[in-house]
């Protein structure tokens, strides 16, 4: 099951970083994808390194929506609590199917013979128009003992 968080305004780097960290704390969240306008390649205050649970990566978009793959509907209440705390300007949380889980013909055209080398957790997370260096960053959830 997937959920879309649609903030009523674009998120800056600080808010994106806080939101992703709080969402990562929710045990029912399996994967997260951020979507938005690409930031200009030159100096921009939001094009910076952000940290999500100790994993650092360069934020390359002005966050307009966050897609989450979740385990069950009970997780939605936890997601809404996080949004209520961090997005006072308003937001919509909508369940649906947003993240692809199977390889497509487009993937085959994009990756060619290397398609079998694409990790399963990357399926549905990459921008087919992006260069390899700009593709998704996977943040692995630490196993709880």
UniProtKB/Swiss-Prot annotation:
Electron transport is among the record's keywords: no
Protein biosynthesis listed as a keyword: no
Keyword entries, A-Z: Methanogenesis
GO biological process terms, semicolon-separated: methanogenesis
NCBIfam families named among the record's database cross-references: met_CoM_red_D
Subunit text: MCR is composed of three subunits: alpha, beta, and gamma. The function of proteins C and D is not known.
UniProt name for this protein: Methyl-coenzyme M reductase I operon protein D
Native source species: Methanothermobacter thermautotrophicus (strain ATCC 29096 / DSM 1053 / JCM 10044 / NBRC 100330 / Delta H)
